[in-house]
């Protein structure tokens, strides 16, 4: 287990809790949180935050000795020490925060995962799979690193083949050329 990243995740979430700032773990760490175990080494920590409260997340990053490094079309990259944070906003949509363009329910209010004994909010299985569909549009799956192939397999197995195919059809119909 990568205790450096686990410790940092716990520090970030504790600081967010002090501010009543909901954060969701995304990407590979969300898969691990939902499974309740670390499945692989992670290159970064994906975080989803309320878009209108971005300044509060930036303040947490700075308080922990980090900085925002780069603006992206979907959010920003930050670093704390040697650890990379990939941060994406979610926006309030009637009754819950949602990631733009992701399936409804992308940011559950409840803590649906666990990282090293700490309950955490994490992106939904559907949002995780949706990200893999975007990735497959950019990089053919035959060219994916083994870690991404395995993480995708774990996510698909957890969600179920039928639900994955329904999502894939929705993704294709939304983004058909």
UniProtKB/Swiss-Prot annotation:
The keyword Transmembrane helix does not apply. GO terms for biological process: response to antibiotic. Binds 2 Mg(2+). Residues 93-177 are annotated as: C-terminal domain. The active site is at residue 86. Its EC number is 2.7.7.46. It catalyses: nucleoside triphosphate + gentamicin = diphosphate + 2''-nucleotidylgentamicin. Kanamycin A binds at residue 100. GO terms for molecular function: aminoglycoside 2''-nucleotidyltransferase activity; metal ion binding. Its cofactor is Mg(2+). Mg(2+) 2 binds at residues 44, 46, 86. Keywords: Antibiotic resistance, Magnesium, Metal-binding, Nucleotidyltransferase, Plasmid, Transferase, Transposable element. Mg(2+) 1 binds at residues 44, 46. The keyword Nucleotidyltransferase applies. Residues 1-92 are annotated as: N-terminal domain. It comes from the Bacteria. Has an N- and C-terminal domain; kanamycin binds in the cleft between the 2 domains. Monomer. This is 2''-aminoglycoside nucleotidyltransferase. The lineage of its organism: Bacteria, Pseudomonadati, Pseudomonadota, Gammaproteobacteria, Enterobacterales.
